[in-house]
Amino acid sequence: MCLKEDYYSGLGSNMHAGYNFQLLVSKGIILHYFVCQDRNDMTTLIPFLSSFNSLYGFFPKRLCADSGYGSFSNLQFVYDNNIHSFIKTLDWASLLSGDSIQLFHFDENNNLFCLNNKMAQKLDYYFGRHPHGKYSFYLISYCHRCKFKSICQKSLKSIKNERVFETNSDFYSLRQLNINNLLSPKGIEMRVNRSSQVEGAFGVIKQDMDYERVRRKGIDNVSAEIMLVCLGYNIRKLFLLLSGKAKLDYWVAPIDLQSESLPIPNLNKLLKTESKKKGKNASLRTSYKHKKGR
Protein backbone atom coordinates (compact mmCIF):
# COMPACT_ATOMS: atom_id res chain seq x y z
CA MET A 1 0.00 0.00 0.00
CA CYS A 2 1.02 3.66 -0.32
CA LEU A 3 1.97 5.41 2.92
CA LYS A 4 1.45 9.00 4.00
CA GLU A 5 5.18 9.63 3.78
CA ASP A 6 5.03 9.06 0.03
CA TYR A 7 2.26 11.61 -0.35
CA TYR A 8 3.82 14.31 1.81
CA SER A 9 7.29 13.85 0.33
CA GLY A 10 6.06 14.85 -3.12
CA LEU A 11 8.19 12.13 -4.68
CA GLY A 12 5.27 10.07 -5.90
CA SER A 13 3.68 6.88 -4.64
CA ASN A 14 5.67 3.81 -3.75
CA MET A 15 4.31 0.42 -2.79
CA HIS A 16 5.10 -0.83 0.71
CA ALA A 17 4.18 -3.84 2.80
CA GLY A 18 2.07 -2.02 5.37
CA TYR A 19 -0.76 -2.44 7.84
CA ASN A 20 -3.83 -0.34 8.56
CA PHE A 21 -4.02 0.38 12.29
CA GLN A 22 -7.37 1.54 13.76
CA LEU A 23 -8.09 2.77 17.29
CA LEU A 24 -11.26 3.26 19.31
CA VAL A 25 -10.61 5.83 22.04
CA SER A 26 -12.84 7.11 24.84
CA LYS A 27 -11.71 9.92 27.15
CA GLY A 28 -8.09 9.37 26.19
CA ILE A 29 -8.13 5.60 26.91
CA ILE A 30 -7.72 3.07 24.10
CA LEU A 31 -10.65 0.66 24.35
CA HIS A 32 -10.06 -1.36 21.20
CA TYR A 33 -7.69 -1.71 18.28
CA PHE A 34 -7.94 -3.28 14.84
CA VAL A 35 -5.22 -4.25 12.39
CA CYS A 36 -5.83 -5.10 8.74
CA GLN A 37 -4.24 -4.65 5.33
CA ASP A 38 -7.02 -2.69 3.63
CA ARG A 39 -5.69 0.31 1.75
CA ASN A 40 -8.50 2.64 2.84
CA ASP A 41 -10.57 3.10 5.97
CA MET A 42 -14.00 2.76 4.35
CA THR A 43 -14.09 -1.04 4.48
CA THR A 44 -12.63 -1.34 7.99
CA LEU A 45 -15.39 0.18 10.12
CA ILE A 46 -17.84 -2.74 10.04
CA PRO A 47 -15.29 -5.46 10.97
CA PHE A 48 -13.81 -3.06 13.56
CA LEU A 49 -17.16 -2.50 15.30
CA SER A 50 -18.04 -6.19 14.97
CA SER A 51 -14.83 -7.18 16.74
CA PHE A 52 -15.58 -4.60 19.45
CA ASN A 53 -19.03 -6.14 19.91
CA SER A 54 -17.65 -9.68 20.09
CA LEU A 55 -15.20 -8.57 22.80
CA TYR A 56 -17.46 -6.37 24.96
CA GLY A 57 -20.90 -7.74 24.09
CA PHE A 58 -22.31 -4.38 22.96
CA PHE A 59 -21.75 -1.61 20.45
CA PRO A 60 -20.64 1.93 21.37
CA LYS A 61 -23.51 4.31 22.15
CA ARG A 62 -21.97 7.08 20.07
CA LEU A 63 -19.41 7.03 17.29
CA CYS A 64 -17.47 9.90 15.75
CA ALA A 65 -15.19 9.26 12.78
CA ASP A 66 -13.62 11.23 9.95
CA SER A 67 -14.84 11.45 6.38
CA GLY A 68 -12.96 8.33 5.29
CA TYR A 69 -15.71 6.20 6.85
CA GLY A 70 -18.77 7.98 5.41
CA SER A 71 -20.04 5.31 3.01
CA PHE A 72 -23.62 4.07 2.69
CA SER A 73 -22.82 0.60 4.05
CA ASN A 74 -21.10 2.08 7.12
CA LEU A 75 -23.94 4.48 7.88
CA GLN A 76 -26.51 1.71 7.39
CA PHE A 77 -24.61 -0.61 9.74
CA VAL A 78 -24.27 2.07 12.41
CA TYR A 79 -27.96 2.99 12.39
CA ASP A 80 -29.08 -0.66 12.24
CA ASN A 81 -27.18 -1.27 15.49
CA ASN A 82 -28.61 1.82 17.25
CA ILE A 83 -25.30 3.69 17.34
CA HIS A 84 -25.69 7.46 17.46
CA SER A 85 -23.62 8.41 14.43
CA PHE A 86 -21.35 11.43 14.08
CA ILE A 87 -19.44 10.20 11.01
CA LYS A 88 -18.31 12.98 8.72
CA THR A 89 -19.54 12.80 5.15
CA LEU A 90 -17.12 12.34 2.25
CA ASP A 91 -17.50 16.02 1.29
CA TRP A 92 -17.50 17.39 4.83
CA ALA A 93 -14.63 19.83 4.30
CA SER A 94 -16.33 21.25 1.20
CA LEU A 95 -19.62 21.55 3.07
CA LEU A 96 -17.99 23.63 5.81
CA SER A 97 -16.28 25.91 3.28
CA GLY A 98 -19.44 26.38 1.19
CA ASP A 99 -17.80 24.94 -1.94
CA SER A 100 -19.90 21.79 -2.07
CA ILE A 101 -23.15 21.86 -4.04
CA GLN A 102 -25.80 19.20 -3.68
CA LEU A 103 -26.48 18.32 -7.32
CA PHE A 104 -29.75 16.58 -6.50
CA HIS A 105 -32.27 16.05 -3.73
CA PHE A 106 -35.16 13.72 -2.97
CA ASP A 107 -38.67 14.82 -2.08
CA GLU A 108 -41.03 13.08 0.35
CA ASN A 109 -42.07 10.63 -2.39
CA ASN A 110 -38.44 9.64 -3.10
CA ASN A 111 -38.45 11.43 -6.45
CA LEU A 112 -35.06 12.80 -7.45
CA PHE A 113 -34.75 16.42 -8.59
CA CYS A 114 -31.60 17.92 -10.07
CA LEU A 115 -30.05 21.29 -9.30
CA ASN A 116 -32.28 22.89 -11.94
CA ASN A 117 -35.33 21.35 -10.21
CA LYS A 118 -36.07 18.84 -12.98
CA MET A 119 -37.48 15.48 -11.91
CA ALA A 120 -35.43 12.44 -12.91
CA GLN A 121 -36.56 9.19 -14.46
CA LYS A 122 -35.64 6.09 -12.47
CA LEU A 123 -33.97 3.39 -14.58
CA ASP A 124 -33.35 -0.29 -13.96
CA TYR A 125 -30.24 -0.18 -16.14
CA TYR A 126 -28.35 2.34 -18.27
CA PHE A 127 -26.49 1.40 -21.47
CA GLY A 128 -26.26 -2.21 -20.36
CA ARG A 129 -24.95 -1.30 -16.91
CA HIS A 130 -26.84 -2.37 -13.83
CA PRO A 131 -26.62 -0.28 -10.64
CA HIS A 132 -24.26 -1.36 -7.89
CA GLY A 133 -25.86 -3.01 -4.86
CA LYS A 134 -28.87 -1.12 -3.54
CA TYR A 135 -28.28 1.88 -5.79
CA SER A 136 -30.46 2.98 -8.72
CA PHE A 137 -29.95 5.01 -11.88
CA TYR A 138 -31.75 8.36 -12.23
CA LEU A 139 -31.78 10.02 -15.66
CA ILE A 140 -32.06 13.78 -16.26
CA SER A 141 -32.69 14.57 -19.95
CA TYR A 142 -32.47 17.72 -22.09
CA CYS A 143 -29.58 19.37 -20.26
CA HIS A 144 -28.28 21.36 -23.26
CA ARG A 145 -29.75 24.67 -22.03
CA CYS A 146 -29.22 24.17 -18.31
CA LYS A 147 -27.29 27.03 -16.71
CA PHE A 148 -25.77 24.67 -14.13
CA LYS A 149 -24.28 22.39 -16.76
CA SER A 150 -20.70 23.49 -16.11
CA ILE A 151 -21.05 22.61 -12.42
CA CYS A 152 -23.11 19.46 -12.77
CA GLN A 153 -21.02 17.83 -15.49
CA LYS A 154 -17.53 19.07 -14.66
CA SER A 155 -16.54 15.64 -13.31
CA LEU A 156 -17.60 13.87 -16.51
CA LYS A 157 -15.16 13.01 -19.29
CA SER A 158 -17.38 14.63 -21.93
CA ILE A 159 -20.24 17.11 -21.82
CA LYS A 160 -23.57 15.49 -22.64
CA ASN A 161 -27.19 16.55 -22.96
CA GLU A 162 -28.19 14.25 -20.15
CA ARG A 163 -26.98 13.39 -16.68
CA VAL A 164 -27.29 10.09 -14.85
CA PHE A 165 -27.00 9.83 -11.07
CA GLU A 166 -26.32 6.48 -9.43
CA THR A 167 -27.56 6.90 -5.89
CA ASN A 168 -29.92 5.65 -3.21
CA SER A 169 -32.72 7.51 -1.46
CA ASP A 170 -31.96 5.69 1.82
CA PHE A 171 -28.34 6.84 1.63
CA TYR A 172 -29.51 10.40 1.01
CA SER A 173 -31.77 10.37 4.10
CA LEU A 174 -29.07 8.76 6.27
CA ARG A 175 -26.56 11.31 5.04
CA GLN A 176 -28.87 14.23 5.87
CA LEU A 177 -29.57 12.80 9.33
CA ASN A 178 -25.85 12.35 9.92
CA ILE A 179 -25.13 15.95 8.86
CA ASN A 180 -27.77 17.20 11.31
CA ASN A 181 -26.12 15.18 14.08
CA LEU A 182 -22.72 16.66 13.25
CA LEU A 183 -24.05 20.23 13.32
CA SER A 184 -25.83 19.78 16.67
CA PRO A 185 -24.18 20.85 19.96
CA LYS A 186 -23.48 17.19 20.74
CA GLY A 187 -21.95 16.79 17.30
CA ILE A 188 -19.64 19.75 17.89
CA GLU A 189 -18.64 18.20 21.22
CA MET A 190 -17.92 14.84 19.60
CA ARG A 191 -15.89 16.38 16.77
CA VAL A 192 -13.73 18.41 19.14
CA ASN A 193 -13.03 15.38 21.33
CA ARG A 194 -12.27 13.12 18.37
CA SER A 195 -9.61 15.55 17.14
CA SER A 196 -7.90 15.71 20.54
CA GLN A 197 -8.34 12.11 21.69
CA VAL A 198 -7.91 9.87 18.65
CA GLU A 199 -5.38 12.02 16.83
CA GLY A 200 -3.73 12.70 20.18
CA ALA A 201 -3.38 8.97 20.88
CA PHE A 202 -1.70 8.41 17.53
CA GLY A 203 0.53 11.42 18.19
CA VAL A 204 1.67 10.06 21.56
CA ILE A 205 2.38 6.63 20.09
CA LYS A 206 4.36 8.03 17.17
CA GLN A 207 6.13 10.96 18.83
CA ASP A 208 6.41 10.32 22.58
CA MET A 209 6.72 6.53 22.36
CA ASP A 210 8.78 6.76 19.14
CA TYR A 211 6.82 3.96 17.48
CA GLU A 212 6.41 4.34 13.73
CA ARG A 213 7.29 0.91 12.36
CA VAL A 214 6.21 -2.63 13.24
CA ARG A 215 8.96 -5.13 14.02
CA ARG A 216 7.07 -8.31 13.13
CA LYS A 217 5.58 -9.86 10.00
CA GLY A 218 2.21 -11.45 9.47
CA ILE A 219 -1.19 -10.12 10.50
CA ASP A 220 -1.35 -12.18 13.74
CA ASN A 221 2.12 -11.17 14.89
CA VAL A 222 1.52 -7.52 14.01
CA SER A 223 -1.81 -7.58 15.90
CA ALA A 224 -0.03 -8.94 18.98
CA GLU A 225 2.60 -6.21 18.70
CA ILE A 226 -0.03 -3.47 18.35
CA MET A 227 -1.84 -4.91 21.39
CA LEU A 228 1.34 -4.48 23.47
CA VAL A 229 1.77 -0.93 22.18
CA CYS A 230 -1.82 -0.02 23.15
CA LEU A 231 -1.35 -1.69 26.54
CA GLY A 232 1.79 0.35 27.13
CA TYR A 233 -0.06 3.51 26.11
CA ASN A 234 -2.88 2.83 28.59
CA ILE A 235 -0.45 1.99 31.44
CA ARG A 236 1.45 5.19 30.72
CA LYS A 237 -1.83 7.13 30.74
CA LEU A 238 -2.91 5.47 34.01
CA PHE A 239 0.30 6.42 35.84
CA LEU A 240 0.03 10.00 34.58
CA LEU A 241 -3.55 10.14 35.88
CA LEU A 242 -2.56 8.73 39.29
CA SER A 243 0.32 11.19 39.60
CA GLY A 244 -1.92 14.13 38.70
CA LYS A 245 0.12 15.01 35.62
CA ALA A 246 -2.77 14.25 33.28
CA LYS A 247 -6.55 14.17 33.28
CA LEU A 248 -9.25 12.44 31.31
CA ASP A 249 -9.48 14.28 28.03
CA TYR A 250 -13.11 15.16 27.35
CA TRP A 251 -14.47 18.58 26.47
CA VAL A 252 -18.12 19.11 27.39
CA ALA A 253 -20.06 21.53 25.21
CA PRO A 254 -21.62 24.51 27.07
CA ILE A 255 -25.34 24.33 27.71
CA ASP A 256 -25.99 27.49 25.68
CA LEU A 257 -24.00 26.28 22.65
CA GLN A 258 -26.03 26.74 19.47
CA SER A 259 -26.17 24.32 16.56
CA GLU A 260 -23.77 25.03 13.72
CA SER A 261 -25.11 25.89 10.27
CA LEU A 262 -23.54 25.24 6.89
CA PRO A 263 -22.84 28.19 4.59
CA ILE A 264 -25.11 28.43 1.56
CA PRO A 265 -23.08 27.94 -1.65
CA ASN A 266 -23.05 30.95 -3.96
CA LEU A 267 -24.07 29.44 -7.29
CA ASN A 268 -23.34 32.58 -9.30
CA LYS A 269 -19.85 32.78 -7.86
CA LEU A 270 -19.20 29.11 -8.61
CA LEU A 271 -20.48 29.53 -12.17
CA LYS A 272 -18.08 32.43 -12.71
CA THR A 273 -15.24 30.37 -11.25
CA GLU A 274 -15.97 27.50 -13.63
CA SER A 275 -16.03 29.85 -16.60
CA LYS A 276 -12.64 31.29 -15.60
CA LYS A 277 -11.16 27.80 -15.37
CA LYS A 278 -11.62 27.37 -19.09
CA GLY A 279 -8.76 29.81 -19.54
CA LYS A 280 -7.87 32.37 -22.16
CA ASN A 281 -6.82 29.78 -24.74
CA ALA A 282 -10.20 28.05 -24.62
CA SER A 283 -12.03 31.31 -25.32
CA LEU A 284 -9.61 32.11 -28.16
CA ARG A 285 -10.20 28.71 -29.73
CA THR A 286 -13.95 29.22 -29.52
CA SER A 287 -13.78 32.66 -31.15
CA TYR A 288 -11.43 31.33 -33.86
CA LYS A 289 -13.82 28.50 -34.74
CA HIS A 290 -16.70 30.98 -34.81
CA LYS A 291 -14.86 33.30 -37.24
CA LYS A 292 -13.72 30.39 -39.38
CA GLY A 293 -17.29 29.15 -39.63
CA ARG A 294 -18.36 32.49 -41.03
Model feature map: region roles:
Residues M1-R294:
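Anion-binding and metal-coordination hotspots
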